[in-house]
Amino acid sequence: MRSNTLLQGIFYGALAGAAWGLVFLAPELTRAFSPWQLTAGRYLAYGLFAAVLIAPRLRKLLPHLGRAEWRALVWLSLLGNVVYYVFLASAVQLGGMAMTSLVIGFLPVAVTIIGSRGHGALPLRKLAPSLALGLAGIACVAWQSLGSGTVGGGAGGFGDGVIGFFCALAALVSWTTYAVGNSRWLGRLQAISAHDWNLLIGVVTGLLSLFVAVPAFTIILQPHPQSEWWHFIGVSAGVAIFASLFGNACWNKASRLLPLTMIGQMILFETLFALLYGFLWEQRWPTLLEIAAMVLVTASVLLCVSAHRVDEGGGH
């Protein structure tokens, strides 16, 4: 793999992480609304925007979409968007941003381990130093979270924090499955670009979110003043545009430029940006442990890049 391709892939991976970090902040901005309502609002907006953007090319794309492609679009939309965000928003509101960022920070480890089994992937022993630094960085955040009590620092008490922790674990499993499946599907596609595939996932996600929206805005709806509704609409639209459309497009671009084992490391950028947004929201500087975590996570990504470059040089 050429160095220029690696740098482009890292750049798009960092942009995706910056955009996706916003999804951790959205539940804090809309605490008056449930995770189900936030998920429905975000993905209804995402589906609408995606439908408008894909409409001019839809007729040309339809002949290339068979039963397998539609089935993949449905399960990728469910796992990577609807199911993932219901659990993530629940985790943030119950357990706090720090705890949720910590658990989701294990994504690179999970994806990299799975990716190391693929054909042509680097063996796990060559990725061990990078993974060790990544785990050390996550451990720093864990120590900080446990020491400050943020694991139980949600709106409820310790009980809500435990529930939030398991919600974050469920989100981790959901998105790990999506990341691996989506990367492999992007590798198979010939006549459909990564951008169009992202928009198709958006359209399908919007349709699936209707099944969430009906009960979310009828059965469990509570009265809200008009100002809160406008705030909710603004946050939903903003997350749909920046995280779902822009972030996913950057991620799909990175997925085509980088091997699966390296894609797993790129998810670390989401953790870094989520922590950064959390500091800005809480109006404080990071602690020494948090700074150490950022340094370790960044070093983990750089070591992963180095491992792939060494493998490239040794193979030719």
For each feature predicted by the language model, list its residue ranges.
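Glycine-/small-residue-enriched transmembrane alpha-helix faces in small-molecule transporters
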Residues: 1-40, 149-187, 207, 316
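Loop-to-transmembrane-helix transition segments
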Residues: 8-16, 60-87, 163-171, 220, ...
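Helix-helix packing/entry segments at the starts of transmembrane helices
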Residues: 11, 17, 41, 81, ...
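Transmembrane alpha-helices of multi-pass small-molecule transport proteins
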Residues: 32-83, 108-114, 173-181, 198-219
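C-terminal-most transmembrane helix of multi-pass membrane proteins
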Residues: 43, 143, 260, 264, ...
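Hydrophobic transmembrane alpha-helices of multi-pass small-molecule transport proteins
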Residues: 50, 54, 123-152, 289-308
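C-terminal transmembrane-helix exit sites in multi-pass transporters
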Residues: 53-57, 107-132, 142, 272-291
